[in-house]
Amino acid sequence: MNEKLALSDDILMKIEKPARYIGNEVNAVVKDLNNIDVRFCMCFPDVYEIGMSHLGIQILYGMLNSWDDVWCERVYSPWVDLDAIMRKENIPLFALESQDPVKNFDFLGITIQYEMCYTNILQVLDLAQIPLLAEERGDDCPIVIGGGPCTYNPEPIADFFDIFYIGEGETQYRPLIDLYKKCREEKVGREEFLRRAAKLPGMYVPRFYETAYHEDGTIASFRPTEEGISATIRKELVTDMTDSFYPMKPVVPYIKVTQDRVVLEIQRGCIRGCRFCQAGQLYRPVRERDVEILKKYAMEMLKNTGHEEISLSSLSSSDYSKLPELIDFLMEECNKRHINISLPSLRIDAFSLDVMSKVQDVKKSSLTFAPEAGSQRLRDVINKGLTEEVILQGSALAFEGGWTRVKLYFMLGHPTETEEDIRGIAELSNKIAATFFDTVPKEKRVNGRVQIVTSTSFFVPKPFTPFQWAPQCTKEEFVEKAYLTRKAISEQLNQKSIKYNWHEADVSVLEGVLARGDRRLSQVLLYVYHKGCFYDAWSEYFHNDVWMEAFAACGLDPDFYSHRERPLDEILPWDFLDCGVSRAFLEREWQKAKNETISPNCKQACQGCGAARFGCGICVEPRG
């Protein structure tokens, strides 16, 4: 236990939730500085409660600390109240475990999960008193390394990072740290370390690449500036999930966080191939963990944390081949210990409903469907393997089982979307409500009514998806679509049973710009940050007018990045990365979308996406 605190009692008493900053949580790792060689600070650039809920941080934290020569600590974005105090009193950002300044570490690793956290990256660097621009850092600064899904287009933030780790973090940190130690022994400086790091698999060092542009703003070329540095960086991948590291002693916070439970990752990847979904492409191929190992992990983590709930983590839990066996085991063991089980990402069918009725309070819980589009035509465009018949059958089974609350998730603005598709959202919501009244006798209806919560987000095209070439709607178009949805719901027979929620259009448009932007956007990020923008993912701190001012000041048009269809022969900012899925496959899927043609999932038939080259997972298993 570390008794030192970077913040005085006076400051801790002034701020919201001081437990965010004092460390010493259950299973936090403290090491003797005299016995380690490398100090690594792992950062999630958002508030503590969100960062502490992220499984990837827990995996890397546990893995790095399993090595005797490394001490990995954590840091999160200070909330706005402490941010103001730290600036006023010149308190440098500190790591939780040692309470030492982050600027004194060897590495600062930042996981980047969401584009709207980009300004928080600048906040972290600024509060840590590390120069924002990588080119301005000297040998006394930490190596700033970024990872996570947003690094599959790292260009908008390339100027702020020394290294991007492309792919899954379990494979290359050991070679990177060994290289760092070797360079330190040889007394070579930062530049030479980065030059050597750029030759490691999965490492992208932006300073050794340059971009040229056409007069119209599109990319003319992107190439390395030195010999021996690869023009293409291939993602890192864990080929055997069963043997890969998993944290048996995850850190347990003192305050309630977003995901306050044991998280058991049962598999990585998804077989479904939804054309809008970036995760479904990035994490190919699907790789399962052995069910016996998962049983052991579950019991060990529950024992080591004292958590009262366990959740299965996967993009599509229903596709895990040993799910019935695993759930039977967990139900038996967790019932003995009065542990709750959370089962997200399940398809709603008879098996799932039977399981959920045993592990949830039916009267209090709600069922979730994600049709994503209102019509079957548009669901075929996006390759969402879910028919209206399946949704209504699942709803009927659920209502028979006692459920009275249903959540529906849709996206507005998919490519080729029409007014008829949008009206389909209201019509499907109404049909589900009607199914309740047709299925449940009047005397058995709780409060006499079903609750349908229909939510729409706005479509954001992402790199390495078949829709990476698609235009995004403007803010005005998005708002018009949301109003049309609301009006159509109000016209339904069962409209009193339907509640409608929709997302902020400004944020979705900006997310789209940052998701498919190039290196020139770094000047926009610097502009808005210096104007006071951070925590842009939080609506109360998002200032769209400042962002629009920044684009104008920097001579950049946000519509160039979002509101145009990109030709197939255009060089995209992320084309130098190899995510395992081929460009030819994405082009085929883009054409299939335009033709309203579906593709079978990976278990039904291989679509030749390119992931088979990794020689693991679903790609080497028999299909049927």
Regions found by a protein language model. Name each.
Residues 54, 256-292, 608-623:
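Canonical Radical SAM [4Fe-4S] cluster-binding loop centered on the CxxxCxxC motif
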